[in-house]
Amino acid sequence: MGQVLPLVTRLGDRIAIVSGLRTPFARQATAFHGIPAVDLGKMVVGELLARSEIPAEVIEQLVFGQVVQMPEAPNIAREIVLGTGMNVHTDAYSVSRACATSFQAIANVAESLMAGTIRAGIAGGADSSSVLPIGVSKKLARVLVDVNKARTMSQRLKLFSRLRLRDLMPVPPAVAEYSTGLRMGDTAEQMAKTYGITREQQDALAHRSHQRAAQAWSDGKLKEEVMTAFIPPYKQPLAEDNNIRGNSTLADYAKLRPAFDRKHGTVTAANSTPLTDGAAAVILMTESRAKELGLVPLGYLRSYAFTAIDVWQDMLLGPAWSTPLALERAGLTMSDLTLIDMHEAFAAQTLANIQLLGSERFARDVLGRAHATGEVDDSKFNVLGGSIAYGHPFAATGARMITQTLHELRRRGGGFGLVTACAAGGLGAAMVVEAE
């Protein structure tokens, strides 16, 4: 093990993660249909505070994220403060780092703690793929602005006469990268081809993810960290994630056709994470503040790293890039880890990152490092399943993973955990946490 270099405040306090909670995750247009992300965020933060029994005034900052932005609530963090009975003077702002958004929120609160500007804060994220900002065409948008400035009815009618039927069609949110036009699934297909990842390997990983997630729920391991959601019309609560296939079989995966490269592809709906609704949050404090309040932390944030690469080819390599940095900053190696939790955007992306973490050539020629980061031990990897099974509300996934990893570390008597994810725009994130 390398030299221990924990993150600490100016007074020498470690950054404590006191507690974490999430809503159940629901597939698009199912249990949370019609519930906007801001309401999901209020739901989880309100329940987190109630369960922790921490007075709301103790929380000095709330940093929250949302990837699918809603124009009517651009600062979701502030709306959560105002909608949960927190002190109105609580500092609150919103962040977005695509699928690594709650990693960023946690890092921001940690930096405030290290700077000494706060002693306690909440970080998290929420997203709804069921309540989307449906837009209008560029031509209609321009005409509507001009109509608003027109002074006479004849001027307004003349402007409207320029429109065609196609200009009136609603425009859904983009599912492709702004800079390249590539969908995430297209990038996953690139990675499968680049790194020789077969359809069978992808399906096997997806099957493993569902099996382990189903077992985690069956064993009661997730009850403490997932709240029961009561949603309109309040006829039936949602207590568990509804995407997990408890009866998953490999034969079922083989029946599906490729979703992106229809002719030669291997990426399917079943070996990809689905569009999902949900929210997750964690409470962070300085270690001394937690002791003052009589709280036993779940664990501590030891290090973190964010990286960025080119977006045109194999851009979902965030874990392979950010992991060695986070481990180096933590003074650890892969062999020191008790658990590894990697975001499963796609099975192809996950397997490619696993491959590169153990690649001497990638370390030497691409990262400029003397040795590979290290082989991923399957017995430590995504032991409770991953995003393919649980689902992926973009801004909430990081907080889910960190809370889940810390609870599992405590069940195992403590140790170090790596939590890592890829993100749109060629971004990557990794955090090392520890539990005692």
UniProtKB/Swiss-Prot annotation:
It is found in: Cytoplasm. Coiled coil: none annotated. The active site is at residues 99, 392, 422. GO terms for molecular function: acetyl-CoA C-acyltransferase activity. It catalyses: an acyl-CoA + acetyl-CoA = a 3-oxoacyl-CoA + CoA. InterPro entries: Ac-CoA_C-AcTrfase_FadI, Thiolase, Thiolase-like, Thiolase_acyl_enz_int_AS, Thiolase_AS, Thiolase_C, Thiolase_CS, Thiolase_N. GO terms for cellular component: cytosol. The keyword Cytoplasm applies. One of its GO terms (biological process) is fatty acid beta-oxidation. Pathway: Lipid metabolism; fatty acid beta-oxidation. Keywords: Acyltransferase, Cytoplasm, Fatty acid metabolism, Lipid degradation, Lipid metabolism, Transferase. The keyword Ion transport does not apply. It holds the Pfam family Thiolase_C. Its EC number is 2.3.1.16. Catalyzes the final step of fatty acid oxidation in which acetyl-CoA is released and the CoA ester of a fatty acid two carbons shorter is formed. Belongs to the thiolase-like superfamily. Thiolase family. Heterotetramer of two alpha chains (FadJ) and two beta chains (FadI). This is 3-ketoacyl-CoA thiolase. It comes from Escherichia coli (strain SMS-3-5 / SECEC).
